[in-house]
Amino acid sequence: MSSLLDIIYQLRQVPRWDGSFQFEKEDVSQHSFSVIAISHILCELKETLEGKKINKEKLLLYALYHDVTEVVSTHIISPVKKNSILKDPFNAFREQIKNSLFDNLPITLSDTLSTILNNNDLEIQEIVEHADHVDAYCKSCIEVHRGNKDFISIQRSLGDKLDNLTKEYPYLKEFQNLFLKDFPLENKNYRYLN
């Protein structure tokens, strides 16, 4: 019997930002949805600005499953995952999880998911990584906006990194200009049909 459906629903139980006080709790499923949506927007901006075509199906599927290994590893914050001592062992652990998660699936589905998870398109990986970073930054902005002082240094650090990335990636700069200048919006008029 396959565990895929259970894994999908279990991701709702995997908290993000564990160890940090949050006004609004977040799980991996919620985060994945935001990363998918942001990846789509970034892709559209990149295509427009650079005049190129990106395989959106591959991109969005990769974004959908980008953190599926956290069903086993749980969410580990980036500074820990990217620590020079822990980075290689952690990546090896993630590979081991990827290789074992979908063992009992029909071969075609297993092959498809394996192809998605082991995506070697660097452009797609980059867009999803940027979307992942933008989502973390947005989360920190929301928490700070609500008065959570625990996220002030997180917001500053993520914002500085984002500012540096926008110097190299015009589509990120465009995203920042379009969506992040006043985020989160104080006035949510879009909720009312006037």
Swiss-Prot record:
Is the keyword Metal-binding in the record? Answer: yes
Per its Swiss-Prot or TrEMBL entry, what cofactor is needed?
Mg(2+); Co(2+); Mn(2+)
Mind telling me what this protein is named?
A: 4'-phosphooxetanocin A phosphatase
InterPro entries to which the protein is assigned, alphabetical:
HD/PDEase_dom
| UniProt EC number | 3.1.3.112
What does the comment on domains in this protein's record state? Answer: Has a mononuclear HD domain phosphohydrolase fold.
Give the source species. Priestia megaterium
Question: What is the name of the gene encoding this protein?
Answer: oxsA
Which positions does UniProt annotate for Mg(2+) binding?
31, 66-67, 132
Reactions catalysed, as given in the entry: 4'-phosphooxetanocin A + H2O = oxetanocin A + phosphate
Show the Gene3D superfamilies listed in the entry. Hypothetical protein af1432
